[in-house]
């Protein structure tokens, strides 16, 4: 990785000192670096942001000096898209490394690189990283949390690609000096702040990215029904402007706030990466139905009565709560995206199906309202479909919980304890850890033992590995010869994460054959 970084820096330096023609317009700068994404065997999306309206040319070559055959793609950038450029480049050759840059006269961007996916007909190994939850908000000129060191460690893995899995900004961070983002300019500014972290821009430059949003790109825990329409539109526009995501989306669902950003990427014959949009179509939460008469919210409504009493809860949740949580008319994905997911799972020939999920699908009962457990009917439908069709090696790759949590996925851990899939939760990059959040919530409730109770709930469900107090990312590796895949959780120093309660247990998982 160091050799690649040195090469890119050298190429960028040579380009930067090229003379500007006499009489040229003011030099163009590229304050947020470059990025590539949504890579296929034959195409990629290239991204940058200029500092002014202009016409850029994207140059793409297998030669890092751009001296040999170079493809060129012009693109106008305007204030209407905050001077961002997004260019789909094609046709490319499968399983090749490409270098790219943007130019305007003598102004040249940093050089980025990506690798195209191998042909879907051929066996191919793949090694990629994923994480999410990056609050780069500054407090008096200093990071509220850290310098995104987790992303530096992830870059050092030399991954084939990076999955930027939700909460790519915190538009509603408690540390924002002007309060939550509301206007389009507010949201755009949050992306510019995060791009001020070299550890993020260096990773985006060094490999390609598959990105999806979660809630903090708009506002915490938003759904498609109750979200303010203008804030939703502003947050979505800013996300699409600032991430290398293909803007032309292929699914249409009139029942959603907007078309879901569902995509599927094949990496050789062995791996599918299925990206879900779990915000654009979801029904409203049902917290009001799960609130007791005294105004307190049920902390674990789906936990069986004996376990509820063990944790000091009433034997039963409020009347109507479970019916609301399991209402089959409520949706998490929307009917069109749900059917697209089931179709891909059923008919994909890939040995491994990695489902990129913004929120956790495993059961751990505590405050289920904003994740899959809070939409019980659709969750059960998808898991039962996987089981009924004997679909193997389905693995959910997840963030959002601000913790490492690895476990089997069941329809019901107690009533139907047959493993159907696996889930590996990682993160965060830069925000409060789960342990910090739970401790603060417990303090507000007057319960100093809430962290211990949550750990007890994880013990109850037999969590394979957990660490609630670490910044982390995950490394996924597919071995086509052995027919296996592995997932390894690592911290911001690149060290393997271990279970918080069993230090000898490494947070790793083997999938397949």
PLM feature spans:
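Secretory targeting and sorting signals
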Residues: 1-24
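Metal-dependent phosphoester/phosphodiester hydrolase catalytic core
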Residues: 25-513
């Amino acid at each position: 990785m160091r050799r690649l970084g040195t090469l890119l820096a050298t190429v960028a330096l040579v380009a930067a000192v090229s003379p500007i023609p006499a009489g040229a317009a003011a030099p163009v700068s590229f304050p947020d670096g470059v990025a590539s994404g949504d890579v296929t065997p034959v195409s990629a999306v290239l991204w940058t942001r200029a500092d002014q309206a202009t016409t850029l040319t994207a140059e793409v070559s297998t030669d890092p000096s751009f001296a040999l055959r170079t493809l060129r793609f012009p693109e106008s950038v305007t204030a209407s898209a905050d001077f961002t450029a997004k260019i789909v480049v094609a046709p490319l050759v499968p399983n090749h490394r490409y270098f790219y840059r943007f130019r305007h006269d003598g102004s040249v961007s940093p050089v980025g690189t990506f690798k195209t996916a191998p042909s879907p007909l051929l066996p191919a190994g793949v090694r990629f990283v994923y994480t999410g939850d990056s609050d780069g908000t500054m407090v008096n000129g200093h990071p509220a949390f850290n310098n995104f060191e987790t992303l530096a460690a992830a870059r050092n893995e030399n991954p084939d690609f990076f999955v930027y899995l939700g909460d790519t900004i915190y538009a509603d961070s408690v540390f924002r000096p002007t309060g939550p983002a509301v206007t389009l300019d507010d949201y755009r500014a949050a992306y510019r702040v995060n791009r001020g972290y070299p550890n993020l821009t260096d990773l985006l430059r060094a490999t390609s990215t598959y990105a999806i949003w979660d809630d903090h790109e708009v506002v915490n825990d938003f759904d498609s029904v109750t979200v303010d329409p203008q804030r939703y539109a502003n947050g979505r526009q800013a996300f699409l402007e600032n991430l290398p995501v293909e803007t032309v989306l292929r699914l249409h669902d009139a029942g959603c706030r907007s078309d879901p950003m569902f995509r599927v990427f094949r990496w050789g014959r062995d791996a599918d990466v299925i990206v879900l949009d779990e915000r654009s179509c979801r029904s409203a939460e049902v917290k009001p139905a799960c609130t007791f008469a005294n105004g307190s919210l049920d902390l674990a409504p789906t936990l069986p009565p004996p376990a509820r009493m063990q944790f000091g809860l009433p034997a039963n949740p409020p009347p109507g709560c479970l019916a609301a949580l399991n209402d089959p008319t409520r949706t998490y994905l929307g009917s069109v995206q749900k059917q697209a997911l089931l179709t891909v799972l059923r008919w994909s020939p890939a040995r491994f199906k990695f489902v990129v999920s913004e929120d956790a699908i495993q059961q751990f009962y505590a405050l289920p309202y904003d994740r899959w457990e809070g939409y019980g009917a659709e969750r059960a439908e998808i898991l039962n479909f996987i089981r009924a069709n004997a679909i193997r090696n389905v693995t959910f790759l997840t963030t959002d919980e601000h913790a490492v949590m690895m476990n089997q996925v069941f329809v019901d851990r107690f009533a139907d304890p047959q493993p159907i899939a696996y889930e590996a939760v990682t993160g965060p990059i830069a925000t409060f850890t789960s342990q910090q959040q739970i401790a603060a919530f417990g303090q507000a409730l007057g319960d100093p033992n809430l962290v211990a109770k949550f750990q007890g709930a994880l013990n109850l469900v037999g969590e394979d590995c957990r660490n609630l107090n670490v910044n982390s990312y995950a490394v996924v590796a597919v071995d086509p010869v052995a027919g296996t895949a592995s997932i390894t959780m690592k911290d911001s120093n690149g060290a393997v994460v271990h279970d918080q309660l069993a230090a000898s247990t490494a947070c790793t998982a083997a999938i397949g054959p």
